[in-house]
């Protein structure tokens, strides 16, 4: 019954702290209005009072069910144009907006916690709000498949992302017919806060952002709705301005970790292929998580002329990383800028590194900042986006042999050691495992054939081959473990492909030629 669900959602708002006790009547009336109801029946309210009270834990578990029933009712009553995932997402965001505090209240509370308790207390509050508001859809995030893979470079994180809903055909058709709008300009713009959304743009009435001053300019802080790792946040420029890696970038990253020392923050590179999916709006990504790259040790200490006070080294990592650390962030900014400028103009034909071809620049950096006690630390990942006939998607990009698992750009998150793999792999791997258990060939399968060479390459490591009969001795659980391990090893190869200097004697010698160039 919809009135009961209205009371249940109101209680959810009170228990989670989205709404204050004084907001109860107001919230009920707003929800009645949304569902085009004139009253709350006394007997419904009386019966509800006798129920077991909600707790924070039961509230979290209950939200998906409450919203599902509300959406079913809205569909039956014609309150949505179509009963599809796109329109349901637009409408349930509108439902949740009825519980939300105004932006000014959120900012005041965040700043109060920051000033009187700690930066972590402030982010704890804001992250919980972003989850409780259903801006971060916890019940979808739980569907993501996650595991780890041990390698000589450390423990890599692997995830198959299932929390982004598939676009339904009706929504795709409607989006094509919809009037094209330039508002908000992109998914990151501050104008998204409170926006009702449309068929080709997500609703954001339950979205809140926090103003932060970084390096003297106006930026904003929010969480990613897809949370690839703990407290995955986005820090974005108040202006819709393109990504650019420059001296000021290092200052902004270090300023942010000075203000939020429990978070790391990094920037995608500013060139296609080696950059992220949004190059049109300057932004960083951070969070409360330590990636494999952050844990990776320095394999070779180096020094830079005039910066003997700055600790520097090449990181033991499949991509090409210079780590620098110092007590004074100004020294890091100076050195990072020197390395960036040297790399932008650097060509080493013997190592197949070209600063530009036909006037198109190729060299850039993916920078990551963090605090280590009293020290500031920067990891500078050298990137190059040159393409060739043999590698049309990029020489320093996953090569074709690995595309059956990962062909998308290697952005900041992957660089640090977390594979974000496409949703298609969930079914493909399940079908692949079943075919292996049954001893049937996958070369004839239209979808699975792309995995055949890979499978035939790794199976002998585990003592059997296709159709040998020995696969019958392997349990489904063990086979699943094997496939997950091998996907992790593919991701390691993906990172090695993306590294401009390979982890070989020849590669490290070439790396040192660049270090010498910086020192020249």
Go through the PLM ranges and name each one.
Residues 1-235, 239-242, 316-318, 332-336, ...:
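Active-site microenvironments that recognize anionic phosphate/pyrophosphate groups
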Residues 206-208, 238-265:
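Helical scaffold of the NTase/Pol beta-like nucleotidyltransferase catalytic core
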Residues 248, 257-280, 286-340, 344-347:
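Catalytic or ion-translocation cores adjacent to nucleophile or general acid/base/metal-coordination motifs
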């Amino acid at each position: 019954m919809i009135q009961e669900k209205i009371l249940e959602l109101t209680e959810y708002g009170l228990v989670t702290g989205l709404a204050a006790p004084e907001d109860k009547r107001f919230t009920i009336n707003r929800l009645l209005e949304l569902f085009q109801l004139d009253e709350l029946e006394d007997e419904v309210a009386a019966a509800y009072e006798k129920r077991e009270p909600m707790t924070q834990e039961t509230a979290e578990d209950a939200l998906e069910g409450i919203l599902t029933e509300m959406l079913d009712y809205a569909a039956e009553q014609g309150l949505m144009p179509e009963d599809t995932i796109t329109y349901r997402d637009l409408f349930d965001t509108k439902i949740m907006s009825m519980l939300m505090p105004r932006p000014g209240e959120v900012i005041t509370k965040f700043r109060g916690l920051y000033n009187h308790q700690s930066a972590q207390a402030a982010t704890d509050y804001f992250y919980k709000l972003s989850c409780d508001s259903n801006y971060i859809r916890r019940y979808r995030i739980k569907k993501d498949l996650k595991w780890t893979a041990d390698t000589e470079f450390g423990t890599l994180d692997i995830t198959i992302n299932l929390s982004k809903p598939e676009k339904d055909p009706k929504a795709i058709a409607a989006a094509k017919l919809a009037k094209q709008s330039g508002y908000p300009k992109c998914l990151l713009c501050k104008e998204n806060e409170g926006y009702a959304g449309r068929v080709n743009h997500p609703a954001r009435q339950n979205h809140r952002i926090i103003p932060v001053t970084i390096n003297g300019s106006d930026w904003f802080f929010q969480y990613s709705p897809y949370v690839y790792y703990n407290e995955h946040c986005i820090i974005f420029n108040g202006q819709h301005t393109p990504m650019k890696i420059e001296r000021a970038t290092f200052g902004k990253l270090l300023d942010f970790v000075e203000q939020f020392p429990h978070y790391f923050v990094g920037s995608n590179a500013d060139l296609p292929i080696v950059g992220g999916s949004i190059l049109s709006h300057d932004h960083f990504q951070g969070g409360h998580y330590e990636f494999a790259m952050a844990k990776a040790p320095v394999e070779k200490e180096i020094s830079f002329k005039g910066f003997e006070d700055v600790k520097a080294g090449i990181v033991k990592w499949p991509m090409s990383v210079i780590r620098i650390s110092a007590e004074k962030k100004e020294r890091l900014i100076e050195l990072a800028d020197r390395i960036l400028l040297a790399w932008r103009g650097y060509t080493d034909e013997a190592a197949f590194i070209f600063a530009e071809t036909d006037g198109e620049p190729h060299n850039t950096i993916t920078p990551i900042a963090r605090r280590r006690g009293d020290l500031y630390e920067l990891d500078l990942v050298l990137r190059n986006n040159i393409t060739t006939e043999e590698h049309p998607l990029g020489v320093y990009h996953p090569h074709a042999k690995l595309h059956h698992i990962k062909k998308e750009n290697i952005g900041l998150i992957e660089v640090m050691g977390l594979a974000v793999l496409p949703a298609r792999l969930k079914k493909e791997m399940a079908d692949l495992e079943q075919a292996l258990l049954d001893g049937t060939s996958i070369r004839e399968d239209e979808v699975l054939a792309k995995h055949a060479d890979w499978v035939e390459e790794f199976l002998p490591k585990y003592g059997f081959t296709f159709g040998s009969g020995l696969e019958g001795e392997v349990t489904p659980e063990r086979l699943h473990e094997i496939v997950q391990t091998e996907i992790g090893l593919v991701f390691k190869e993906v990172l090695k492909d993306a590294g401009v200097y390979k982890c070989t004697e020849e590669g490290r010698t070439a790396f040192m030629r660049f270090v010498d160039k910086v020192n020249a």
